C-alpha cells in the first residue's frame, strides 16, 4: 500500500531530515522523492510505502501534521488511490 506525502513551506534547515526521520519512526519507507526550492519556498513530494505501519492511518496523519508544525511547514499525506482519484483528468 502506498501514500503520497507533500511538504510545503518556507525553506529552512532540517526539513528533509525531520520529515525523513519521522517517516522512519512510523515504519514508512520512501519509494521516490522530488524536492525543490522555489523563490525561498520549500516543496517536496514523496511516494511512500505504508504497508509496514503499525498505527492507524489517521494517527499517522496526525503525527505528521504535528511534525510539520514543529518544522514550520505543512505536511499532507493521503493514500495513493485517493490522490489518483482526485487528480485524474
From Swiss-Prot:
Pfam families in the record: ACT_6
Domain ACT: from-to ranges: 4-78
Family designation: Belongs to the UPF0237 family.
PANTHER family assigned to the protein according to its UniProt record, in alphabetical order: UPF0237 PROTEIN MJ1558
Protein name: UPF0237 protein lin0537
Species, as recorded: Listeria innocua serovar 6a (strain ATCC BAA-680 / CLIP 11262)
Amino acid at each position: 500500500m502506498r501514500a503520497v506525502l507533500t511538504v510545503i513551506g518556507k525553506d529552512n534547515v532540517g526539513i528533509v531530515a525531520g520529515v525523513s526521520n519521522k517517516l522512519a519512526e512510523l515504519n514508512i519507507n520512501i519509494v521516490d522523492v522530488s524536492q525543490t526550492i522555489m523563490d525561498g519556498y520549500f516543496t517536496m513530494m514523496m511516494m511512500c510505502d505504508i504497508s509496514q505501519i503499525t498505527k492507524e492511518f489517521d494517527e499517522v496523519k496526525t503525527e505528521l501534521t504535528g511534525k510539520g508544525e514543529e518544522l514550520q511547514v505543512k505536511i499532507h499525506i493521503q493514500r495513493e488511490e485517493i490522490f489518483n482519484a482526485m487528480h485524474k483528468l
